[in-house]
């Protein structure tokens, strides 16, 4: 615990640990396979709050295992290149990769949002014209659609193309079916195995820190933030995503903006590491 105490005394822990927790929360809020698949699965099987907890914790467990493997591998490699002359260069290279990851996430989020806005505008124009030409038929079809596919309200929230495809497939396969707890756990475990830029960021941070205890603590904090979000999403889906969206209009906006905050946070971490690496090289 000595290295952890020193880093805390220097104030580094108060930057990295909250950042890891926030990064985990934001990662869970981002439009992505785990969150969308979980919500679609819970709604399709009409799952209970207990099942939502199970699904969220299972997804977090497998996702955390991947992060642990990546982070521990990074710390193992960092021990092999622990020379003081090499470490600043590793910090600078890590910072460049992190900043590149942040820019890619920001651009991908912006592009996805523009596509979603374009699609929403097209749908609005179509509905507007349809109301004028076939008012009676439109009202009838709309009511019937609402009663037959209540989970379809999810499509009104911002999702990328992969999310919509996965959610639609899950709803078709599991709609109204009874599933066992083992199937729920397996679904959660497999859904959490998808790697993410946040895990890569944790890997590079651990390489920069040269600290096993703090690195492990960061992974734990990231997992805690992710678990909070995934469990909350699962429980929210079990209670009703429709009600959450109806009662708080900011829910959709928050989910849409979360990747921006996440990319900015990753960028700040990369900038912090880059400054330290550059300072070490100049010395």
From Swiss-Prot:
Biological process (GO), any one: response to cobalt ion
Gene giving rise to this polypeptide: rcnA
Gene3D superfamilies: Nitrogenase molybdenum iron protein domain
Main location: membrane
Localization per record: Cell inner membrane
Induction: By nickel and cobalt. Transcriptionally repressed by RcnR.
Membrane topology reported for the UniProt record: Multi-pass membrane protein
One Pfam family hit: NicO
Family statement: Belongs to the NiCoT transporter (TC 2.A.52) family. RcnA subfamily.
InterPro entries according to UniProt: Ni/Co_transpt_high_affinity (IPR011541), NiCoT_RcnA (IPR051224)
Residue ranges of the TM segments: 6-26, 52-72, 86-106, 184-204, 219-239, 261-281
GO molecular function, one term: monoatomic cation efflux transmembrane transporter activity
Identification of the protein by name: Nickel/cobalt efflux system RcnA
Periplasmic face of the membrane: 1-5, 73-85, 205-218, 282-283
Entry keyword annotation includes Protease: no
Originating organism: Salmonella arizonae (strain ATCC BAA-731 / CDC346-86 / RSK2980)
The organism's taxonomic lineage, starting at the top: Bacteria, Pseudomonadati, Pseudomonadota, Gammaproteobacteria, Enterobacterales
């Amino acid at each position: 615990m000595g290295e952890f105490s020193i880093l805390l005394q220097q104030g580094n822990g108060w930057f990295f640990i909250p950042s890891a927790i926030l990064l985990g929360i934001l990662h869970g809020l981002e439009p992505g396979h785990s969150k969308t698949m979980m919500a679609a699965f819970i709604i399709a099987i009409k799952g209970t709050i207990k099942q939502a907890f199970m699904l969220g914790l299972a997804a977090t467990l497998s996702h955390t295992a991947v992060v642990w493997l990546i982070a521990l591998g990074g710390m193992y490699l960092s021990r092999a290149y622990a020379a003081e002359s090499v470490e600043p260069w590793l910090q600078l290279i890590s910072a460049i990769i992190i900043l590149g990851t942040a820019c890619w996430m920001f651009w991908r989020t912006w592009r996805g949002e523009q596509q979603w806005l374009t699609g929403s505008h097209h749908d609005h124009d179509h509905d507007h014209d349809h109301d004028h030409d076939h008012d009676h038929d439109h009202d009838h079809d709309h009511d019937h659609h609402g009663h037959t596919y209540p989970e379809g309200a999810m499509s009104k929230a911002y999702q990328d193309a992969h999310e919509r495809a996965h959610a639609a497939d899950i709803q078709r396969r599991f709609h109204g079916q009874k599933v066992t707890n083992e199937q729920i756990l397996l679904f959660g475990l497999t859904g959490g195995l998808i790697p993410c830029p946040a895990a890569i960021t944790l890997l590079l941070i651990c390489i920069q820190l040269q600290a096993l205890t703090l690195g492990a603590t960061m992974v734990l904090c990231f997992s805690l933030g992710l678990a909070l979000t995934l469990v909350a999403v699962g429980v929210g889906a079990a209670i009703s995503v429709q009600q959450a969206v109806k009662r708080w209009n900011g829910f959709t906006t928050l989910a849409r903006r979360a990747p921006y905050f996440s990319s900015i946070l990753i960028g700040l971490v990369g900038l912090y590491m880059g400054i330290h690496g550059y300072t070490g090289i100049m010395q």
